[in-house]
Amino acid sequence: MSTGIWIMIVIIALLVGAVGGFFFARRYMENYLKNNPPINEDMLRTMMLQMGQKPSQKKLHQMMTAMQNQSKK
């Protein structure tokens, strides 16, 4: 086989791998978010009520801010 054909095969294989990897990663992230949804204020409010605390809007906002800052680290 000529060198040009080998180069075309390599380029096509790289493109197929990149497209396949994109769709695999997308499906993985969709499944991950479905199984582990991000925590929102309603979930925090329910969790605090279950622990016997009375959740105020200020306390919920502080906890959400702290969790967002922690996830950025």
Curated annotation (Swiss-Prot):
Primary localization = membrane
The domain of life is Bacteria
GO CC annotations on file? plasma membrane
The UniProt keywords, alphabetically, are: Cell membrane, Membrane, Transmembrane, Transmembrane helix
- Kindly indicate whether the keyword Cell membrane belongs to this entry: yes
Transmembrane stretches, by residue range? Answer: 5-25
Q: Where in the cell is it found?
A: Cell membrane
Name the InterPro entries for this protein. UPF0154 (IPR005359)
Pfam families in the record, alphabetically?
UPF0154 (PF03672)
Topology in the lipid bilayer: Single-pass membrane protein
- Family (UniProt): Belongs to the UPF0154 family.
Q: What is this protein called?
A: UPF0154 protein PEPE_0872
Q: Which organism is it from?
A: Pediococcus pentosaceus (strain ATCC 25745 / CCUG 21536 / LMG 10740 / 183-1w)
